[in-house]
Amino acid sequence: FDVIEFPAILEFEDEDGGLIEKPLWPEFFDLEALLRTKASMPVFQWNAQYQQKPTAEEASIVKREWWNEWEKETPPACEYIIMSLDAAAERHNRADFTALTTWGVFLNEETSAYNIILLNSIKQRIEFHELKELAMSEYADWEPDSFIVEKKSSGVALYQEMRRMGLPVSEYTPHRGSGDKLARLNAVSDIVASRLCWVPQTRWAEEVVEEIAGFPFMSNDDL
């Protein structure tokens, strides 16, 4: 059978690889109105109701309700900070984003157990010089104890350059095949299921939770 989708906001790419958003029915729903609606509801609800991209909760490896919400404005004092980079192959490849996430390990005083919190998430389509600037800026801001770069695509050049600069960056070389990310997520799913992971109440954190909940069925799996 054929699946016909009518997303409320259509996404196109310009000649420079930039993203262009246009409303499906501008005479009735202009882009500003749709973006206001998008900002007013959870990401999973927007994707399902307006973008025709629902995610099946029962099929999720990592479920949304397993995450704890960090309600305070500032994150806890972290004993160990980890940054992870998944670099896109090319900016004009519309399917790929560059994803940079920062995580912290902290002692939960209520449970006397070590927990993990998402400190920041950036997902963009960028060129290598922009990637280098972004990585160096985030590194300076967070001063991570560990910076893991997926050694593929533009991540290879970034890893080599940061090593030459004497920065403590580690490489991760993925195996070939689509099952590698699935195996990695399965390996850490119990940590989230044990309610040891926290996310702040921000839009970018919500997008991380939604993308993980939709894996491996979502079109993008960069985060």
Listing of model-derived features with the role each one plays in the protein:
Residues 1-13:
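Signature of the SF2 helicase/ATPase Hel1-core->accessory helical subdomain module
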Residues 4-7, 119, 172:
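Hydrophobic residues at beta-strand termini and immediately following loops
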Residues 12-87:
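ATPase catalytic-site recognition across NTP-hydrolyzing enzymes
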Residues 44-53, 91-94, 101, 153-223:
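C-terminal nuclease/phosphodiesterase catalytic domains that cleave nucleic-acid phosphodiester bonds
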Residues 50, 86, 100, 135, ...:
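Hydrophobic, well-ordered secondary-structure elements that form the walls
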Residues 75-106:
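Gly/Thr-rich phosphate-binding beta-strand-loop-beta motif of the actin/hexokinase/Hsp70
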Residues 88, 122, 152:
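Anionic group-transfer/hydrolysis microenvironments
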Residues 101-149:
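Nucleic-acid-processing active sites and adjacent nucleic-acid-binding tracks
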